[in-house]
Amino acid sequence: MAKPSSGLVHRHTPNLEVYNARGMSVRQVAYLKADEQEPMQRLVTLTRRSANEQWRGQWDPRLFERLEQETDLAPSQQVTSALSGVTLLEESRDAGWRLTLHGEAGQATHAWDSRASHWQTEYDELLRPVLIRETAGGQPTRVAESFSYAREEGLNRRGRLVRHDDDAGSRMIDSYGLTGQELGETRHFLAALDLPDWPDAALEPGAGASTHWRYGPLDQVLEQTDAQGHRQCSGFTLGGELTRLTLHLNDGRQHPLLVETRYNAFGQVERQTLGNDVVRHAQYDPANGRLERMQASRPGRSQLQDLLYGYDPVGNVTRIEDLSQPVRHFANQRIDPVSNFVYDSLYRLTEASGREAVGAMIGPGLPELTPFPGDTSQLLNYGQQYHYDASGNLLSLRHVGQQDYTRSLNVAADSNRAVPAPGNPLEAFDGNGNLLQLAPGQPLQWNARNQLHSTRQVARTDGDDEEHYRYGGNRLRLRKVISRRVAGRQRRSETRYLPGLELHESEGERLAVITVDTGHGLIRCLHWSEGQPEGIANPQLRYSLDDLHDSSGLELDGDARIISHEGYYPFGGTAWWAAGSAIEASYKTRRYSGKERDSSGLYDYGLRYYAPWLMRWINPDPGGDVDGLNRYRFVRNNPLTLTDHFGLNPQDQHYSIKKFSKEPKEPGAERMLNGLGESGMSLLRGKGPIAEFAYNTNWSVREYLHLGASNQAGDIKRSDYEAATAGSHMRDLIGSQPLHRSRAEHSLAASTGFCDEFGIISVFLMASSADWPNVPIYSVKQPVHRSAILGDPRITDPLTVDPWVTYPVVHPWSQSHNSTGNVELSNFTPRMPGDPEYAIGYQQVDALREQHYQDLPVFDDDVMEARLDSWLATGKVWTQVSAMKDPQSVFYVLDGQQQNAAAIPSVQYDATYESLMHVARLRSNPRFAGRLRAF
């Protein structure tokens, strides 16, 4: 039984960061303690930099300890950069090497990797990719992807992508909305499973599978019509939150799925009424917003779910109790419906306890299905202990229960590649770090892009049991084909994945699974056109009651009858499951974290696969080192607290750009800027979506840094000098030249910053946004200022993003003070919309805020007034109202309506007005007037 930690393991275990003389991070030191009685262990991550301060190599804590004896020891990862700073060669002990050559505009033209694969990307005159040639090791060259763009006007498609050919087939975009959303797409699948060579690949005959969307004014999906004509209709609050969902089947039947939703003031769901009359309640800690209790009940019947969550001070889940289940006694044990969790000083899970079924073990398979869902009377207690090395590799799992066992992994000495003992990790992976077999006789095959191509469970001379996978241009799985030998015959089944719809076809059965995400649980509608199983309704609605991490615990039908009940070990293995019907249970595919579990036991997370019995990913992170130097580690070994949605990096939440353009504006507020009322410039019509994105970025940064700028006189006075105090403390902590991410995280924790922080947060938010409008993002650095632009100034006139000024207005770069003088541009263009490399997580920022910014000193007004006077005298404080050379309104067209980039969101008006009034008073004071600085 895991006992709650006393907290003593966390005493005197700070995280340290060491900077060189130029303010660049060169060493990170963590102190590990897993037990109160154990000595503390120092873990050092070393970074070596070149003369121009670019990092060249990094050594993880295991390799660092060997550096004293092996001075020429190669790092965990290293890069070779061009003189411009762009990365040419990346070398990773986990993921192999990758060489990339770039064109004059910074676009990647050629790439090679350690599996002898080669890619060549061709671009059109607008630097849009038009085709990607791929040469896998030892294979002939093929055109793996092809892109076509519309030249003609109509359907808002001009200049936009209208066809994308990929490994699964072709995707045609029928039309776009005024703000750039796709209104319709058609997917054509390949006739064969062979990898295509475009344009010669053969598509299946027919019209393809078409999906259509209808959007509301806040860009929310009001209606989705899937490829079989089923419609999902959604209703929203005035603020854009989902309140109801109705499913209209193609045969005319209608099913309310979500009847009502109620939110608290922070946008968190407090109450949901589902279409089967189940009511869900959620309670949150008002101090930090953490979920405290989650309940689900049926009117007039027993409680279905009542989960009570406990946390330590930094937010790690330490206890989960199911109050809907009674205390049981079985096999001479008292079985409490409680799970407890203990962590070391690095917040890695070290102990866990809970309940499991008789005979359950962590492995690729599921435990034996037991009858009577909801009856937990025959579960047993278990306890687990986890041991890690200095780099975060799980070395062993010790399980104590009905069956005691220990699982050990052998980790390579020079990398984080690991396999179950007594396997040899040096032989178990290819050059890019992809695992080559799940178990002896079960090989894994990978395509050139390090995506799982096929798995084989059983090898036979007369037909194997295997699965094949194909992926779309977004790198997500679109097709799964299963071949099995049954009763002397080879049988094939196939699943195709479309927006909101899965099409399953096998011998004698055709099944469409309509998937609806309520945001707090998945609803699936099983609709058979052929081969309906006996005893199952057609259609059958399945409501999933999920836990904190979206794992499907209870499945209910349309009458709130329990279909299945499942519990999980901390790292995702199924500890027990029960169902009244084995046939019904066999149609459950979404389990741990809401992800699909394949017959191999692997979970498909989207961008890679997870093996719960290994408690690690089976290939390196496709996002690189976004989650640290260990590219196999699963959610930082903290699976109860963190969630990974796509297989890139664990985040509970991250900062995002809010849609201030859709919110009410303060009438006439723009007159504070220039007094000109309706006068101003107009942007080209095609700039509308980009201008909206820039507008939302400006005001999102202003909201997150709500104290204002640390060196703007108006914001300093408005915040009662708190902006200056917190900003000065932040700069003392991060030094003169911190890493961009560290700068952004500390600034968000302090709720203020200087122009450097405002500018860096802007580019991080834009590059990590799913709404990124596919234009280059640059950080703009001048001798005394930093801002951002959307667009490449060598090709077009970009739009300026500068939320540091008191009154930010989106405007052309050519009309900006930020374009004058000596200007240095740094490229922050993401690889994809929502690029996780730039995502900033709330958890890290909250931890910094609690550690460094909670109890800042408060000085008397006289003291701060004297300091402000000193800052004004030395030119450290500004009154920069606008970044425009000629401050004026800027108009752009969106949704057919003219918008003004100088309009202030109503929720931001009071703060902006107060800062401007302070500026006016300071400028009218003869004592200050000559000292105020502005462009």
Feature roles, as predicted:
Residues 17-24, 51-54, 61, 188, ...:
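Glycine-rich, acidic and aromatic/proline-enriched surface loops and short helix-turn segments
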Residues 1-45, 50, 208, 217-220:
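Thioester-forming pentapeptide GCGEQ
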